[in-house]
Amino acid sequence: RDFDSLKQDLATKFQVKKDQVYLFHSGRTAISLALLSQVPRNQKDQPAVAITALTCYAVVQAVKTAGYQPIFLDIDPKTLHFDGKNLEKALKKHPNIKAVIIQNNLGISCDIKNIETIARAHKLFLTEDLAHSLNITYPDGRLSGSLGDAVILSFGKGKSLNTSSGGALIMRKNSKNQLLADPKIASTRPKISDSLRDRFYPFFALHARAFS
């Protein structure tokens, strides 16, 4: 019941249909499956994805798990994220870039207008990773999560929406290989052992702080 209720709430927030929302045990899994859904069945060359050089290992791991080559883009010190110019340079150097992930590190808006314009011009799969930037407003007035072909949420510890663990994928772009149509993949519930660990995490954390 809670599972379906959360999917409906997210569908309402991001203005999509309920069947466009997928829930997983981690945001990392959501990133991998979003990227995998865009690889045609007859794909031969390894695709690449542009990501900010200031990122966590989970994003890199998710990209590699999906079979993509991560292309790290230098950041602007003011935004802690790459800008449109660096994305344009990367596309000239790496024509196999098929996707781009934006993160808005620490809740600071990136150069979204230029990045989106370039992504659309090159038909890149644009993913908004909102692990640290849920509900921020971009300079042009749009809310984070309102423009990506895919939107990623992480419910892990230290994220914008913290439930100890979990992740969500909101898909606005159709899959190229029907991957997400597989009921064994779409919205998988965590193992009982993982659920118990997550429920007791606050107790263990409190115990560790008290006796450290």
Protein language model regions, located:
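Phosphate-binding glycine-rich loop
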Residues: 4-48, 57, 62-64, 72-74
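A short beta-strand submotif of the Rossmann-like class I SAM-dependent methyltransferase core
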Residues: 23, 51, 102
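Conserved AMP-binding
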Residues: 53-55
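Structured binding elements
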Residues: 67
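Active-site phosphate-binding strand-loop segment of PLP-dependent enzymes
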Residues: 79-186, 190, 196
